[in-house]
Amino acid sequence: MSRRREVPKREVIPDARYNDKLVAKFMNCLMVDGKKSLAERVFYGAFDLIEQRTKEDPIKVFKEAVDNVRPTLEVRSRRVGGANYQVPVEVRPVRRQTLAIRWLIGYARSRGEKTMRERLAAELIEASQGRGATIKKRDDTHRMAEANKVFAHYRW
């Protein structure tokens, strides 16, 4: 355990177009090698595509997608008497959001569409409709926690 003082969490500055902290956080996670302007171009381009395809407010689709993907339970490894148990634990709110963002970006990157903005738009639309790879990941995480419910008494 570190003896240094705890580093304070930095406040995320809301993005310019939508004035939303969740959007800014998503763009920061989307950013690679510090290229924020590229991340913004990809993200806002994806929002334009979402608006064209769904004829809905893209911020609404985005928030719905993030809400749908948020996991409530996950498993953590716990070593007890030489055996590793997968112990189901509730996910803290900040981690829920972080996991949702990470999964959305990860599965968008692994899609087959040509450009990243198309991939991101498609993944966000699917997640907002309750389908797609990201939703499957959330369901698998919940299923894993459900299957290991017998080890819940090892929670710490």
From Swiss-Prot:
What is this protein's function per UniProt? Answer: One of the primary rRNA binding proteins, it binds directly to 16S rRNA where it nucleates assembly of the head domain of the 30S subunit. Is located at the subunit interface close to the decoding center, probably blocks exit of the E-site tRNA.
Q: Might you name a Gene Ontology BP term for this protein?
A: translation
Lineage, top-rank taxon, reads: Bacteria
Please name the source species: Magnetococcus marinus (strain ATCC BAA-1437 / JCM 17883 / MC-1)
- NCBIfam families, per the entry: rpsG_bact
Among SUPFAM superfamilies, the record links this protein to: Ribosomal protein S7 (SSF47973)
Q: Does the keyword RNA-binding apply?
A: yes
Q: What is the annotated quaternary arrangement, including any partners?
A: Part of the 30S ribosomal subunit. Contacts proteins S9 and S11.
Q: What is this protein called?
A: Small ribosomal subunit protein uS7
Any one cellular component term from GO for this entry?
small ribosomal subunit
Family note:
Belongs to the universal ribosomal protein uS7 family.
Which Gene Ontology terms cover its molecular function?
rRNA binding; structural constituent of ribosome; tRNA binding
List the PANTHER family.
RIBOSOMAL PROTEIN S7 (PTHR11205)
Instruction: Please provide the record's keywords in A-Z order.
Output: Ribonucleoprotein, Ribosomal protein, RNA-binding, rRNA-binding, tRNA-binding
| InterPro entries (alphabetical) | Ribosomal_uS7 (IPR000235), Ribosomal_uS7_bac/org-type (IPR005717), Ribosomal_uS7_CS (IPR020606), Ribosomal_uS7_dom (IPR023798), Ribosomal_uS7_dom_sf (IPR036823)
| Gene3D superfamilies assigned | Ribosomal protein S7 domain
Q: Which gene encodes it?
A: rpsG
State the taxonomy lineage: Bacteria, Pseudomonadati, Pseudomonadota, Alphaproteobacteria, Magnetococcales
